[in-house]
C-alpha cells in the first residue's frame, strides 16, 4: 500500500469516527436543535417512487436472502472469524457495523443480498452483540436507476452522507458541542462557506448505503432509515465508493 493510500484510509477513518462520536453525543428526542438540525444538510435520501408491478416481490426476496445471510452470524464470534471487523468497537454507538471490506469492494460491481457489506449489531450489557440487520452499499457514482435495479426505490430509500467540511488545524473542537461548525453535524454545508472558514470541502464522504432489518414484522421498520424505529442510521463503514473530490 502506498503512503498516499494509507493517508487516505487514515483520513477517511477519522471522518467516520467523527460521525460516530457526533451521533453518540447529539441530543436524542424532542425537537431538532444544534447538531441534529444541521444533520439535515448532510444527508441525501432517494425519493420514494410509485410502486411498480413486481417491486414488493423483489423486495421481499431480498429480505428473505438477508435473513439467510444473517443466520450464521447470530453468534458475533462467527462474524469475526469470517472476516467481519467491528468499526470503532471502543466508541459507544447505538449500533455497531461489522464490516466485510471484501464484500464491500465486490458490491461496487455487483449486488448479492447474500453477501452484505456490513452486519448490524446492538451491544448488550454483558459485552456481547445482538444481530439486528444488514447494510448493503454501492459506489458513490451509481445512478438512482442502478440503485432501483438493486432494491426498488418504491420500497427502500438509499442514502449518502454529503457536504463534509474538514476543519482547519486547531479547530478540532468545532466538530462537537451544541452548535458544531464542521463535519457531518456541522452548520457548514457548502463549498463556499467551508473554504471561507479555512476548511476542506468533501462533497461525498461515503458511497450509497441502505439498511435492512429482516426480523422486523412492520414493513416500514424492515427498511427503516431513522431512530423512530429503534435503529440508528449513522453509517460510517462503507469504505467502497468513497469519493474525495
Regions flagged by a language model, labelled:
Residues 2-10:
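Bacterial N-terminal signal peptides that target proteins for export
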Residues 11-20:
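Bacterial N-terminal signal peptides
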Residues 30-245:
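Primary mode marks residue(s) on the alpha4-beta5-alpha5 output face of response regulator receiver
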Amino acid at each position: 500500500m502506498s503512503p498516499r493510500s494509507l493517508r487516505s484510509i487514515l483520513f477517511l477513518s477519522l471522518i467516520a469516527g467523527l460521525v460516530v462520536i457526533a451521533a453518540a453525543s447529539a441530543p436524542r428526542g424532542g425537537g431538532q436543535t444544534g447538531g441534529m438540525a444541521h444533520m439535515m444538510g448532510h444527508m441525501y435520501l432517494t425519493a420514494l417512487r410509485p410502486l411498480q408491478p413486481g417491486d414488493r416481490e423483489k423486495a421481499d426476496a431480498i429480505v428473505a436472502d438477508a435473513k439467510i445471510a444473517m443466520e450464521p452470524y447470530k453468534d458475533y464470534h462467527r462474524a469475526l472469524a469470517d472476516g467481519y471487523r467491528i468499526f470503532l468497537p471502543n466508541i459507544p454507538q447505538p449500533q455497531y457495523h461489522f464490516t466485510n471490506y471484501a464484500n464491500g469492494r465486490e458490491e461496487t460491481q455487483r449486488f448479492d443480498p447474500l453477501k452484505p457489506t456490513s452486519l448490524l449489531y446492538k451491544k448488550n450489557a454483558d459485552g456481547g452483540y445482538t444481530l439486528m440487520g444488514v447494510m448493503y452499499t454501492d459506489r458513490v457514482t451509481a445512478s438512482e436507476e442502478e440503485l432501483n435495479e438493486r432494491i426498488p426505490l418504491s420500497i427502500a430509500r438509499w442514502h449518502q452522507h454529503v457536504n463534509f467540511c474538514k476543519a482547519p488545524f486547531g479547530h478540532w473542537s468545532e466538530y462537537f458541542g451544541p452548535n458544531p461548525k464542521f463535519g457531518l453535524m456541522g452548520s457548514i454545508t457548502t463549498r463556499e462557506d467551508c473554504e471561507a472558514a479555512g476548511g476542506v470541502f468533501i462533497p461525498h464522504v461515503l458511497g450509497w448505503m441502505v439498511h435492512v432489518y429482516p426480523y422486523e414484522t412492520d414493513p416500514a421498520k424492515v427498511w427503516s432509515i431513522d431512530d423512530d424505529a429503534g435503529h440508528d442510521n449513522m453509517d460510517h463503514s462503507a469504505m467502497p465508493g468513497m469519493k474525495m473530490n
